[in-house]
Design a protein with these regions (language model features):
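Beta-rich ligand-recognition domains in immune and ubiquitin systems
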Residues: 1-222
Length: 222
């Protein structure tokens, strides 16, 4: 890819970045609101640890999914991939192959190194992946991110998270029937953020992952 083409693509992605990056206003969400039944991966909660794999057919062309479908990297080198309405073309994201419309589930994502932007969470199957993306729960996205050195919950407006350190593992907890979505530090079990109850209306949701301008990778566990 020529330098000019890379510059143009960076500009397009940068426009998406500007659309979805943090808003400085305080948001009406609260940390510490997670009830006992949304604490993830504990025997008393009857949560199932989901064994996720990544779906390459949804991956942005600059995201490289490993052969075992368990990790994803960003490289500033566009792959030759088949065009598809399922594929992210602007937001540097990839989804899980698995989808869910019931049950209590949890999974962990290891953050290897850090860079400009990473995010993890869940997304409605019908949520926009290209064009005008409403990048928060109104548009079917629930998650946490680190962008420009700040940890945030992807709310409207964004909620800044005050953390003592950048988590090495992020644990995602989903209770589909109760509409509970919570995020934890996978090493300490400290709650990072819990979203207000969501109504999925029976629609399937996928695990969602984002990396942009970053030399590290996201690893799925188990």
């Amino acid at each position: 890819m020529s330098d000019r083409a890379i510059k143009n693509l960076n500009l397009r992605i940068g426009l998406i970045d500007l659309q979805v990056r943090a808003v400085s206003e305080p948001a009406p969400y609260h940390i510490g609101s997670c009830m006992l039944n949304c604490i993830p991966c504990q025997p008393a909660t009857n949560s199932i640890t989901a064994n996720l794999t990544l779906d390459p057919s949804t991956a942005h062309p600059w995201l490289y999914v490993s052969q075992d479908l368990k990790s994803v990297r960003w490289k500033e080198m566009k792959q030759q991939v088949n065009a598809s309405p399922l594929r992210y073309e602007l937001l540097a994201s990839v989804l899980s192959q698995e989808s869910f419309n019931s049950g209590k589930l949890c999974w962990e994502v290891e953050v290897v190194e850090e860079g400009e932007w990473w995010g993890v969470g869940i997304v409605r199957e019908s949520a926009n992946r290209n064009g005008q993306i409403l990048f928060d729960p109104r548009g079917g996205y629930w998650g946490v991110q680190r962008i420009s050195g700040k940890h945030q919950a992807i709310t409207h407006p964004r909620t800044n998270l005050t953390l003592s350190h950048s988590p090495r593992r992020i644990r995602v907890s989903l209770d589909y029937s109760q509409g509970l979505i919570a995020f934890f530090d996978g090493d300490t079990n400290a709650e990072l953020f819990t979203f207000p109850k969501a109504n999925f209306a029976g629609e399937k949701v996928h695990a969602w992952f984002l990396i942009y301008k970053w030399n590290g990778q996201l690893l799925l566990h188990p």
